[in-house]
A protein has these predicted regions:
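Extended ligand-binding clefts on enzyme/binding-domain cores
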Residues: 39, 228-229, 235-361, 411-432, ...
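Conserved, well-structured interaction surfaces
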Residues: 76-148, 181, 194-203, 352-357, ...
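Membrane-proximal, proline-rich intrinsically disordered regions
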Residues: 19-65, 312-317, 397, 410, ...
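Short, surface-exposed recognition loops and adjoining beta-strand edges that mediate ligand/DNA contacts
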Residues: 28-32, 58-68, 149-162, 203-291, ...
Length: 482
């Protein structure tokens, strides 16, 4: 019966969450009443569409293999060449649409729960659902402000952020002439929501990796604090996650490799990396099916760069198991080597479960804490965190701990950022967000007809354009400069 109700509520809310941008209209039909009903509403709000993976096309983690013969998905091209708008042929902006739909679901729950006191029997579930709603709203606004507004920095706090409805009724009243609140206000609200979520979720039982629990929430808080330069708080939140979970020792992958004629057979279309016990590091799955990403087909146009792969191949005599996430192991002497190329993305394949995109994982807490240490003059502690990570990534017979004495404060930070790049490649759009906060470096992409496209240092295109549909609905809203 509950499943039938959930389906009904999901279809009901889909009717008024599937409209353009913030244009969400209520309908009179069966409405949720109990805490369990609103739990079902909230579950319908968790994103089940990809809202970040295309951003990797715009980074230094991806190149175009022009020898590939597979058909090119034309909607990928504006991202790769940094077009003035990422919307292909004026198609709707699914990122904007998905994120604001999820905000609406969260707001619906928070509106209903505001001022209510649950019964003793309801209290635990009531607080869990409310805490998840706060966490989900913060998560969505984190993505919205990092996609459509300037990065967090003192000089950007008063610049236009994104529309920020905090009630479901706000959406109904403001489908026209929406207002972009400032960047600073959005980040302030994200932190407020995370604080409220923490109060509700602490001590609550996890309900699965497709929902926020307290540990996943702390991992997300560590991310937010890192982005906002609150390094002490980032260290504290990341430490909670690190103390609560254990890293997967990739030496266990050796059993996949022993006795194989080709290493590529270990992580092929049948077995992605996520099918190993590596999945135990995942704290939160999000978005659509991970094996639908653009980078894991052998003959696809867009592939991981060799620069990324080479960060896992620093020493030819050392086996870093992470190389197998990005290395195609194609035979250079084969007729189709040029088309296959040296790289492929093996994280996802045709799993039967656990196949959504990685939203948060344990290793992010390690590289976040290491970066926070490095930025606060604790370079030795940063290297210690890297060693804790690398001993689980490198073959035991090859592993040699990094020597703290070999690093200056500057080189320690650089190494941390390199390990972060490897660990978080293709996870939740993090590379694009990191590039934005790390000075918006210049990037060059070679594409068809020998043309080289350039994203300049500090380029305005590091901020996505406000969707055309929103521009039409809110003609007075400032758009992002180009």
């Amino acid at each position: 019966m509950k499943k039938i109700f959930y389906t009904s509520v999901f279809l009901l809310l889909t009717l008024f969450c599937g409209c353009d941008l913030l244009d969400i209209k209520p309908v009179n039909s069966m409405l949720p009443k109990s805490v369990e009903d609103f739990e079902s509403v909230l579950l319908g709000g968790y994103p089940r569409e990809n809202f970040f993976i295309n951003t990797d096309l715009a980074t230094d983690n991806v190149y175009a293999n022009l020898s590939a013969t597979s058909a090119v998905t034309k909607s990928y091209e504006p991202w790769f060449v940094w077009a003035a708008t990422h919307q292909y042929n004026e198609a709707e902006d699914t990122y904007w649409k998905q994120l604001y739909s999820s905000v609406f679901y969260a707001n619906t729950v928070l509106d209903e729960f505001a001022g209510k006191t649950p019964t003793t029997e309801e209290k635990a579930l009531f607080e869990t659902v409310r805490g998840e709603a706060y966490a989900l709203r913060a998560y969505c606004y984190f993505y919205l402000v990092n996609l459509y507004a300037e990065n967090y920095a003192d000089e950007n706090m008063d610049k236009p952020g994104v529309p920020m409805p905090l009630s479901a009724s706000d959406v109904h009243q403001n489908t026209q002439n929406n207002v972009r609140v400032s960047v600073g206000k959005v980040w302030e609200q994200i932190e407020k929501d995370l604080d409220e979520a923490s109060k509700d979720l602490v001590g609550k039982e996890s309900k699965g990796k497709y929902r926020f629990d307290y540990i996943a929430l702390q991992a997300f808080k560590a991310r937010v604090y890192l982005f906002t330069g609150k390094y002490k708080e980032a260290i504290e939140a990341a430490s909670y996650v690190i103390d609560a979970k254990s890293l997967f020792d990739m030496n266990e992958i050796q059993s996949y490799l022993d006795g194989l004629d080709k290493i590529s057979n270990a992580f092929s279309y049948t077995y992605g990396f996520i099918d190993t016990d590596y999945r135990n590091e995942v704290l939160f799955f999000v978005g659509g099916k991970g094996n639908g990403n653009p980078y894991y087909y052998y003959k696809t146009r867009f592939k991981p760069t060799e620069e990324l792969l080479n960060l896992c191949k620093r020493d030819p005599g050392v086996v870093d198991y992470r190389r197998y996430i990005f290395e195609s192991n194609a035979d250079p002497g084969s007729a189709d080597y040029a088309e296959q190329g040296p790289t492929v993305y093996r994280m996802f394949a045709t799993q039967q479960s656990d196949c959504y995109y990685i939203g948060l994982k344990l290793s992010e807490a390690y590289v976040t804490r290491a970066e926070a240490y490095a930025r606060t003059g604790e370079k030795d502690l940063a290297i210690e965190d890297l060693n804790r990570l690398l001993v689980t990534r490198i073959k035991k017979t090859d592993y040699v701990a990094l020597d703290k004495a070999d690093f200056t404060a500057e080189t320690a930070l650089q190494r941390v950022l390199e390990e972060r790049r490897v660990e978080l490649a293709f996870d939740g759009g993090m590379r694009w967000f990191d590039l934005r906060r790390l000075g918006k470096p210049g990037i060059r992409h070679a594409y068809e007809n020998g043309q080289v496209h350039t994203l300049n240092q500090g380029d305005l295109r590091y901020v996505l354009q406000i969707p055309l549909s929103e521009q039409l609905n809110s003609p007075n809203m400032p758009i992002n400069p180009r």
